[in-house]
Swiss-Prot record:
It comes from the Bacteria. Produces ATP from ADP in the presence of a proton gradient across the membrane. The alpha chain is a regulatory subunit. The gene is atpA1. It catalyses: ATP + H2O + 4 H(+)(in) = ADP + phosphate + 5 H(+)(out). Transmembrane segments: none annotated. One of its GO terms (cellular component) is proton-transporting ATP synthase complex. It is a peripheral membrane protein. The keyword ATP-binding applies. Belongs to the ATPase alpha/beta chains family. This is ATP synthase subunit alpha 1.
Amino acid sequence: MVSIRPDEISNIIRQQIEQYDQQVKVDNVGTVLQVGDGIARVYGLEQAMAGELLDFEDGTVGIALNLEEDNVGAVLMGDGRDLQEGSTVRSTGKIAQIPVGDALIGRVLDALARPIDGKGDINTSETRLIESPAPGIIERKSVYEPMQTGITAIDSMVPIGRGQRELIIGDRQTGKTAVAIDTILNQKSEDVICVYVAIGQKASTVAQVVEVLRERGALDYTVVVAANANDPATLQYLAPYTGAAIAEYFMYNGKHTLVIYDDLSKQAQAYRQMSLLLRRPPGREAYPGDVFYLHSRLLERAAKLSPELGEGSMTALPIVETQAGDVSAYIPTNVISITDGQIFLSSDLFNAGLRPAINAGISVSRVGSAAQIKAMKQVAGKLKLELAQFAELEAFAQFASDLDQATQNQLARGARLREILKQPQYSPLPVEEMVAVIYAGTNGYLDDVPTDKVTEFVQGMRDDLKANHAKYGELVRSEKKMGDEAEGILKTAIADFKKSFMAAV
């Protein structure tokens, strides 16, 4: 029989007491009252914060948006099919945040920065809140460096600077995404990190964009954030803020970034859907009252930082879709008033074969002219004036039959200037070539070239400049202006090329 020694028992009890670790964990737990349409009403989460992440028992994550007297209205970031009345909900005490860092470059992510490209997990230790306050006045510097898009019509007449917000607006199928993608492609040698945010688009469209970027080597400096049309409205609402947070990380590390939100109309629609289901009162066009703040707090995060903060920048190109060219609708007017200018794409111009279909008359850049390089300023002023006069005369010429010679000359030149602004998709131009083309157009070198041969002439002239007059490009790139030497080389080059071209026509 085993004898029990009292001292041994007391030792065991003492050891057990020493090892006992009492941890009291207080959980804020609630119960689902009602669930459906991506919305859950939860009872019992007294300590919930606005925007706090909630864990539902089936693994779905939600965000507390409505804090009411007796319940919390939460939006779900999943389908929530297994949720039912009585399911438990825990508050996490956290606000939505995402991983950030260099490891994200070249990846395709969802609205919570989780990879969806099948290339494995993202290894990064840093995180950033999805919603962050925008830089204050003292933390900013005015825009002064150019953000070249490589599109002649934009860089000459509607210039964009680093840190600017420039809206791209137009009807469906007018080439809005094409302008944005060309701008990304043009950053290849500029050391700019690009973030493309696709909101509410078909997965096939996003795949096409990713393929274009990959083929042309642009995915090496681009992050793609996609909330597809079949994703919950919550993710479509969050995607632009995720893109902004990723770009902000690089901006605060002294780098230059470009963010494209394609498009904010769909984000506003997703937010309207969430708000109406949460029973928030509808306003104009059934959008909630804070839809202006939805976009202003997003676009105000784009900035050019002061030297003390490293002079990084975040340039935003939001896209908004109009219905039948109506720029006076609610969302277009809101975003126009928030941004520093807009590029208006017209379906009439697009169908008439002018692509990119930029309507120079109502497109404007409020701060970009300060960032335009001197070489472009020297030639762009005349281009703008002549195109404006041409547009006026063209309307008048439809009714008048007998026009004097000066008017006919002006119409002929205007038609050729319009031709030089045509550009194929995915072929952005370096700034020195754009300057040369505009110089040739505004100084009368194209006046006797047949209109249908202008594109061919311009292409040949650019090739000739690259092959035989490389010094011109070097001078413009280094001096950032059209000096006497560069202008001399250009004049000779255009005259020589024109002679051989006209002989062959």
